[in-house]
């Protein structure tokens, strides 16, 4: 980095409009959600379609709606901000009556408000970098674990040294959908890494981009992270004594001291869950104490369906960030170190109506669907798993072959 770039970073201010409109637009969404949350779709938990026009108008630069039935991805800035709402840990999903709602984690929100503006800015950058999976916005997951910002960085370095002019190459817009992805490009604008020029007379797109230019801030800041981006596989920022993420940039930005560190929506409450477990046309309803391990839950499911337990298994669910996690049998490898012997049912981010999978016997590939029907807070120390309702004959675990 040059001395001028270092000084530029040191002098950078953080407010509603600098280095981009990220903090203003993100705060607008938090205020809109309030204490009651907002309705989201049942499948991918995205903003309800009926809310999109209103949310779009709340943005600093709203897009002109050209589509008859716009979706969340039709508004790249909203799509990117939704990703940050989930990846930051500031929100979580609940089922309220028949509606699925996105709620604010009040504990995390208190921590958020205790941060200064530079700390809020870099907390969101951290969330994008480490947890910004496309899966959160209902797309096919891509990118690298622990560096979801790579697509944006690669695009910035390869295509924006002299800027990108789409005036005479409108077909190039389609390539932006794939790299860096329109939501990532919108986030780059919100973070102030790029400036984007629009001209609706030259483009029929909902987001009529005609020119993308890197900013001084984008050039300088991304140089601070260049080593971490290029060699992220060799960095372990969670190891005690390891160099913290963003250490070079924070050395220049003296107001950046703390980060958002969400701890979850609440402490685990002692009680009993009712799960409806289905396999084919058969189902069993199980009453399960929250304090038992996932190994014990697995055993209860297999017993309820008259399956033996001579095979490996895993539980598959979406965490509070909206990213799929696998909790594996202790004999399996798990890159995140999540094992069924170490985790209790009550430690999962369960809510009424939530669905998750018990994947058993990877050869025959049995997949049991679990639905959380209810939870009752109670002393579960003397409770044991039990079947409270059953219907249908389960499939045979082992087929008999005639020779």
List PLM regions with ranges.
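Short linear regulatory motifs enriched in tryptophan with gly/pro/ser
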Residues: 2-18, 179-196, 201-403
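Accessory beta->alpha helical hairpin/"wing" motif in late/C-terminal subdomains of nucleic-acid enzymes
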Residues: 81, 92-143, 195-244
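Extended intrinsically disordered, low-complexity coil regions enriched in Ser, Thr, Gly, Ala
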Residues: 49-53, 92, 163-168, 178, ...
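Short amphipathic alpha-helical interaction segments
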Residues: 71-87, 173-195
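Short, amphipathic alpha-helical interface elements at domain boundaries
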Residues: 1-80, 96, 107-112
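Hydrophobic residues on short alpha-helical segments
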Residues: 23, 27-30, 146-157, 185
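Short acidic, hydrophobic short linear motifs in intrinsically disordered regions
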Residues: 37-69, 141-176
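Short, solvent-exposed secondary-structure capping/transition elements
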Residues: 42, 78, 87-101, 310, ...
């Amino acid at each position: 980095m040059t001395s001028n770039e270092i000084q530029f970073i040191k002098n950078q201010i953080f407010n509603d409009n600098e280095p981009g409109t990220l903090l203003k637009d993100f705060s607008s969404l938090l205020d809109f959600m309030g204490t009651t949350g907002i309705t989201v779709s049942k499948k991918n938990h995205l903003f309800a379609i009926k809310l999109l026009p209103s949310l779009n108008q709340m943005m600093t630069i709203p897009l002109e709606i050209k589509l008859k039935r716009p979706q969340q991805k039709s508004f790249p800035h909203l799509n990117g901000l939704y990703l940050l709402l989930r990846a930051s840990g500031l929100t979580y999903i609940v089922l309220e009556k028949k509606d699925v709602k996105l709620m604010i984690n009040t504990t995390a929100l208190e921590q958020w408000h205790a941060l200064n503006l530079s700390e809020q800015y870099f907390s969101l950058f951290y969330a994008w970098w480490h947890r910004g999976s496309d899966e959160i916005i209902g797309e096919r997951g891509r990118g690298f674990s622990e560096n979801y910002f790579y697509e944006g960085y690669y695009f910035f370095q390869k295509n924006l040294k002299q800027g990108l002019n789409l005036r005479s190459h409108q077909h190039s817009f389609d390539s932006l959908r794939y790299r860096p992805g329109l939501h990532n490009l919108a986030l780059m604008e919100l973070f102030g890494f790029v400036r984007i020029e629009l001209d609706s007379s030259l483009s029929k797109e909902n987001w009529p981009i005609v020119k993308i230019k890197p900013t001084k801030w984008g050039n300088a800041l991304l140089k601070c992270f260049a080593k971490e981006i290029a060699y992220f596989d060799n960095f372990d920022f969670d190891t005690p004594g390891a160099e913290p993420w963003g250490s070079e940039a924070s050395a220049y930005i003296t107001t950046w001291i703390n980060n958002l560190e969400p701890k979850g929506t609440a402490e685990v409450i002692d009680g009993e869950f009712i799960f409806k477990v289905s396999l084919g046309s058969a189902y069993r309803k199980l009453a399960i104490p929250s304090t038992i391990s996932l190994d014990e839950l697995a055993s209860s499911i297999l017993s309820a369906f008259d399956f033996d337990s001579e095979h490996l298994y895993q539980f598959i669910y979406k965490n509070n960030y909206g990213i799929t996690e696998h909790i594996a049998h202790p004999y399996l490898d798990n890159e995140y170190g999540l094992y069924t012997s170490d985790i209790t049912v009550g430690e999962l981010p369960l809510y009424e109506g939530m669905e998750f999978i018990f994947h058993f016997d990877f050869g025959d590939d049995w997949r049991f669907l679990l639905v959380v029907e209810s939870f009752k807070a109670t002393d579960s120390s003397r409770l044991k798993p039990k079947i409270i309702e059953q219907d249908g004959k389960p499939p045979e675990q082992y087929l008999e072959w005639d020779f």
